[in-house]
Amino acid sequence: MEKSQHTLFRPCIDIHQGQVKQIVGGTLGNDADVKTNYVSLKPSSYYAELYKLNHLEGAHVIMLGPNCEEAAKTALHTWPGALQIGGGINISNAQNWLQEGASKVIVTSWLFPDAQFDLDRLKAISSKIGKDRLVVDVSCRRKDNRWFAAINKWQVMTAFELNEENLDLLSQYCSEFLIHAADVEGLCKGIDEDLVIKLGEWVKIPTTYAGGGRSIEDLDLVDKLSKGKVDLTIGSALDIFGGVLEFTRVVAWNRRFTPLPLQD
């Protein structure tokens, strides 16, 4: 289905130490220092089922460190062929995750050995699994009004700049971008508006922005700033993750632009 030119809400399931959590992204470097907004008492399958029941396509499951694989598989098995998986993905395990039921795999740090972007790695994994099954996560940090890819739990800033030329290059080998603004991720203090504007100008494939989203107004803002070309993930602000924004409201937002599928 062709992407409608409206920003949609894109859900997430973030897994840390085997549990569904919402964390402050910039604090992920050391487990002892991780700032946690929310730890769910519910299994990953609860969220996968919730997204399935509400026809929320394109959710991403992110494994934040070790001991997350079983919880990730549980989510994928709950809604096979519908959830994307990221966190530690490389050319050796990507096919396995697709076989476990992921719709697409999300690759990040593996593309940056020694913090240097490796185009040959991108070409290789794209060739192996197909660009239609590959999402590139170019999560970033801001420096002097420019944005650079950040890897290894967003702690290492690379020299790979987010700009139209580089995103055009990446888009030859993948079908989608996921972009976490690591400086504002999990803070619920608003989005990086400048980055969203730039992404709206640069991207030519489906793109999801995550970082700082906290309200329905932010969905409307991203829609306007990106001219509907960038979707928005909201995590910590949602009531299903201990926040105040009602999940039913983001579902209703999507229904305005994506009618429910016909029932059999």
UniProtKB/Swiss-Prot annotation:
Biological pathway: Amino-acid biosynthesis; L-histidine biosynthesis; L-histidine from 5-phospho-alpha-D-ribose 1-diphosphate: step 4/9
Organism: Schizosaccharomyces pombe (strain 972 / ATCC 24843)
Subcellular location: Cytoplasm
One Gene Ontology MF term: 1-(5-phosphoribosyl)-5-[(5-phosphoribosylamino)methylideneamino]imidazole-4-carboxamide isomerase activity
EC class: isomerase
Family note: Belongs to the HisA/HisF family.
InterPro entries from the UniProt entry: Aldolase_TIM (IPR013785), His6-like_euk (IPR011858), His_biosynth (IPR006062), Isoase_HisA-like (IPR044524), RibuloseP-bd_barrel (IPR011060)
Superkingdom per UniProt: Eukaryota
Catalytic activity as recorded in UniProt: 1-(5-phospho-beta-D-ribosyl)-5-[(5-phospho-beta-D-ribosylamino)methylideneamino]imidazole-4-carboxamide = 5-[(5-phospho-1-deoxy-D-ribulos-1-ylimino)methylamino]-1-(5-phospho-beta-D-ribosyl)imidazole-4-carboxamide
SUPFAM superfamilies per UniProt: Ribulose-phoshate binding barrel (SSF51366)
Protein name: 1-(5-phosphoribosyl)-5-[(5-phosphoribosylamino)methylideneamino] imidazole-4-carboxamide isomerase
One Gene Ontology biological process: L-histidine biosynthetic process
GO cellular component: cytoplasm; cytosol; nucleus
EC number: 5.3.1.16
